[in-house]
Amino acid sequence: MFGNRNDERLPLQRALEAAASLKPGSWESVESLAVLAIECKGTPEAEQLYQTASRAAAQLKAGTYDAVRALAWLSRAGRELHAVSGRGGEP
């Protein structure tokens, strides 16, 4: 699934590549992108990952466990990325 076992790239680079292959709008993609946004905090990619996750979340079916979990991670990512501005998770 993740390619060559002898891959010398950093885990974050491999995670970003793996996340790009997830189905857009799936709970897996929202959760993965939100976690990656937190991990990339302080980099230009962090906000882009967060925004992509936010757009994907708009397609999630409400009321499922998977949606709740993904949206909770998205909320945490927003809180962590936007804490300084006081926007509390809202883009």
Q: Residue locations for each model-derived region?
A:
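TPR/TPR-like alpha-solenoid repeats
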Residues: 36-39, 74-77, 81-84
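Helix-turn-helix repeat elements of alpha-solenoid scaffolds
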Residues: 5-12, 46-49
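Short, charge/polar-rich alpha-helical segments
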Residues: 3-5, 38-41
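Tetratricopeptide repeat
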Residues: 14-15, 49-53, 74
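Amphipathic alpha-helical repeat scaffolds
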Residues: 16-20, 34, 38, 54, ...
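Amphipathic alpha-helical elements of HEAT/ARM-like alpha-solenoid repeat scaffolds that form extended
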Residues: 28-36, 66-75
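Charged, low-complexity interaction regions
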Residues: 20-29, 41-45, 58-68, 85
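Short, charged, intrinsically disordered terminal tails
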Residues: 2, 79-91
